[in-house]
UniProtKB/Swiss-Prot annotation:
Keywords assigned by UniProt, alphabetized: Aminoacyl-tRNA synthetase, ATP-binding, Cytoplasm, Ligase, Nucleotide-binding, Protein biosynthesis, RNA-binding
Catalytic reaction equation(s): tRNA(Tyr) + L-tyrosine + ATP = L-tyrosyl-tRNA(Tyr) + AMP + diphosphate + H(+)
Protein name: Tyrosine--tRNA ligase
Keyword Methyltransferase: no
Family: Belongs to the class-I aminoacyl-tRNA synthetase family. TyrS type 1 subfamily.
Chain's role: Catalyzes the attachment of tyrosine to tRNA(Tyr) in a two-step reaction: tyrosine is first activated by ATP to form Tyr-AMP and then transferred to the acceptor end of tRNA(Tyr).
GO cellular component terms attached to this protein's record: cytosol
Compartment list: Cytoplasm
Assembly information from the UniProt record: Homodimer.
Organism: Aliivibrio salmonicida (strain LFI1238)
Residues holding L-tyrosine: 38, 176, 180
One Pfam family, short name: tRNA-synt_1b
UniProt binding sites for ATP: 239
EC number: 6.1.1.1
């Protein structure tokens, strides 16, 4: 399968391979047939966040090259929590909570791979289906006997926790490696799965699964890890001042998602294009070269925001994000739909809720903190710096009414070029 050779070369060119077991053997293994691979996603919240995008898209890349992807949702391992490189033990959640999260994450994963009836059609599996059937005696006898505690505590992910003063690691979390390792052995036996992918922090768990599969099934399997995405300024990827960037549009709106990528630093944008899009490496290199000579804002951020928003939220989500962005810039707020404004109310703009049916513009400016005092509010109005729903306000005595609001609910207040507040009439 020449597509596989091209895939591995492409992954390397994109910087998407951190570690790989027996890379030449893996290349040969993948080139001879349609192979089954998997990646695990533990339900630690009711949605995946953008940190999960790299492995999701790599599953998709393998499927495009002719291989069968399995997305494992950790209904069992999610009840325990992966200790890998964590400073402290995770809070344990109830089976009902984790079960609900599993269903939501299963639906999210399904948007990224093709569940057709062909040989390489994707599947979503839940490790509770096989781990939940094991009793304690079977676990200790059939799985635990294959693991050396000496080697387990030498794995860097565990060693850091043991060595950290005041931390330590519980037996519950220490056992996580055995459960994840058993996932690989179980999928190898039931689905002929021969490759596990995951973040570079999963290397210890992946190699544990490779060893267990060899011991239990007498089969050779492989592991490949992906780099953990970092930002050039040292801040955590996927976090903003307002919190985590989620894939679920009810937690992070398509507009806020689009804006996150639009705000990518110049030093990161081309790496992110290689990681998070299906544009070819040559196309990305051309953007990078072209942007070197551009006066003003480079094109890379806009391309990145469009490509990733389309992947996650579809054409409709991208269209609404671009429509909102253009309307806020131009002041043509009449072009916005009620759904667009609901996105702004969710997480796109600072908001102020109003119970009354009318309010003076001066009161609106001070209540929304666009002006620190009535005097300043009047000065801003006098200088032509204030608009409501795209219309300049020239008179400080103007009264805003609910009946004049967009869709009877929203008034977008703008002061200057970039300061906004969304008034929500109750």
């Amino acid at each position: 399968m020449t597509a596989t050779n091209e895939l591995l070369q492409d992954l390397k060119a994109r910087g998407l391979i951190a570690q790989c077991t027996a890379d030449e053997e893996l290349a040969e293994h993948l080139s001879t047939d349609c192979r089954t691979l998997y990646c695990g996603f533990d339900p630690t919240a009711d949605s995946l966040h953008i940190g999960s995008l790299v492995p999701l898209l790599v599953l998709k890349r393998f499927q495009q090259a002719g291989h069968k992807p399995l997305a494992l949702v950790g209904g069992a391992t999610g009840l325990i929590g992966d200790p890998s490189f964590k400073a402290a033990e995770r809070q344990l959640n109830t089976s009902d909570v984790v079960g609900d999260w599993v269903n939501k994450i299963r639906a999210q994963v399904s948007a990224f791979v093709d569940f057709n009836e062909s040989k390489n059609g994707a599947e979503v599996v839940n490790n509770l289906d096989w781990i939940g059937e094991i009793n304690v005696i079977e676990f200790m006898r059939d799985i635990g006997k294959h693991f050396s505690v000496n080697s387990m505590i030498q794995k860097e992910s565990v060693k850091q926790r043991i060595d950290r003063e005041g931390s330590g690691i519980s037996f519950t979390e220490f056992s996580y490696m055995l459960l994840q390792s058993y996932d690989f052995a179980a999928l190898n036996k039931a689905k002929e799965c021969t490759l596990q992918i995951g973040g570079s922090d999963q290397w210890g768990n992946i190699t544990g699964g490779i060893d267990l599969t060899r011991r239990m099934n007498r089969n050779k399997v492989f592991g490949l890890t992906l780099p953990l995405v970092t930002k050039s300024d040292g801040t955590k990827f996927g976090k903003t001042e307002s919190g985590t960037i989620w894939l679920d549009p009810s937690k992070t709106s398509p507009y806020a998602f689009f804006q996150f990528w639009l705000g990518t630093a110049d030093a990161d944008v081309y790496d992110f294009l290689r990681f998070f899009t299906f544009l070819s490496v040559d196309e990305i290199a051309a953007f990078e070269e072209s942007d070197k000579s551009v006066q003003g804002r480079p094109a890379g951020q806009g391309v990145l925001a469009k490509e990733v928003t389309r992947l996650v939220h579809g054409e409709e989500g991208l269209a609404s994000s671009e429509r909102i962005t253009a309307a806020l810039f131009s002041g043509d707020l009449a072009s916005l739909t009620e759904t667009d404004l609901a996105q702004l109310a969710q997480d796109g703009l600072p908001t102020t809720e109003l119970e009354a049916s009318e309010q003076t513009i001066v009161e609106v400016l001070t209540q929304s903190e666009l002006a620190k005092s009535n005097k300043m509010a009047r000065e801003f109005i006098g200088n032509g710096a204030v608009s409501v729903n795209g219309e300049k306000v020239a008179d400080a005595e103007v009264i805003l009414k609910k009946e004049d609001a967009l869709f009877g609910k929203y008034s977008v207040i703008k002061r200057g070029k970039k300061l906004f507040n969304l008034y929500i009439w109750k």
